[in-house]
Amino acid sequence: MMKCVVLVILGLTLLLGTQAMPSSRLSCYRKLLKDRNCHNLPEGRADLKLIDENVQHHFWEGKGCEMICYCNFSELLCCPKDVFFGPKISFVIPCNSH
């Protein structure tokens, strides 16, 4: 009986410990804008590209098309595209990585 209890506790400890370890998955983060203005983005920011003229205040961040930033008043909210739009919608968002 004692052996069974020890095994259950050890199993739960291992299970909870592996879930608590950081994953390599990208997460969301915020960046404050110096001039608190979304209208002049992406001027002066080589790492931001407008997604589409019809989609205001949404930018691709970096060279690829994995992170999307939304300009909201005085900050940029950046998330992986699957988190931002969801996996069913994110694959139809136009990506021009050039």
UniProtKB/Swiss-Prot annotation:
Task: Please give the residues the UniProt entry marks as glycosylated.
Answer: N72
Q: InterPro entries in the record, alphabetically?
A: SCRG1
Transmembrane spans: none
Q: Which residues form the signal peptide?
A: 1-20
Tell me a GO cellular component.
Golgi apparatus
Q: Report the locations given in the UniProt record.
A: Secreted
Covalent S-S links between cysteines: none
Q: Which UniProt keywords are listed?
A: Glycoprotein, Secreted, Signal
Family the UniProt entry places it in:
Belongs to the SCRG1 family.
Task: Indicate where this protein is primarily found.
Answer: secreted
Please report the name of this protein according to its UniProt entry.
Answer: Scrapie-responsive protein 1
Give the record's GO biological process terms: mesenchymal stem cell proliferation
